[in-house]
Amino acid sequence: MKGRYPIDRQFGIWAKFTPSLSRGFLRLAAFFLPLMPKGLSDRRVNVTRVTFEKGGKALLIAAADCAENAPCLVCFHGGGFVFDAARYHYENAKRYALMAGCKVLFVRYPLAPGNPWPAPNDACLAAYRHALSHARELGIDAEKVAVGGDSAGGFLAADVALRAPEAGLPPPCFAMLIYPVIGGEETPSMHRFTDTPMWNARLNAKMWEYYAAGNQVILPGSRDLRAFPASYVETAEFDCLHDEGARFAERLAAAG
């Protein structure tokens, strides 16, 4: 039942909001989200538009005083593979740039249901490839390029980390996975959190319907993880994704 979870008051109205995944709502979101303020009009940061192959677009976000040849985080936003980035995604990217002393390549990838698997994954791998091949132009250190993302973005970050060596690319130096989508198995948290606000198991099932579109998606948890980069994995308390993220972290630890 909604409201039975002791969610912190700092979440405000979002503690009571659950999005629709109807195609009509997705069309509205696709129109309005890009028009929303991004919180990047800040003299502390410089923002540059970047385009690359596979239909991808990105923003390079860096502190105004960021040195050249800086580390870089290639960042993939969440949104269930169907929603564009929200303001808090951009604000988090800005925080990473300001607080970690790195540049952030914030990627906007093609969205389902119009662009199901593997289109988002291919665009994200292309963004990572672009960061490496254009490192000097972007002012980043090609040996210090990490990947990261939240929710669906965490899935895409893990996918890039696994596919990069297969594509003849150096692996990321690090992976930051924030309450990542992993998939592949039924978990207690998926059965328990069917009515949580913002995201729940019912929405998650619909997400997979749109993203997979009848294809057999290659999941991060089904892969050999022995070459996976050093990682940070975060899970959320009242989250249907909790257990799959925790189990993926356990598998990473076991793989060394």
Question: What function would you assign to each model-found segment?
Answer:
Residues M1-D65:
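A glycine/proline-hinged amphipathic helix-loop "lid/cap" segment
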Residues G12, L21, T48-R49, E53-G256:
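Alpha/beta-hydrolase superfamily serine-hydrolase fold, recognizing
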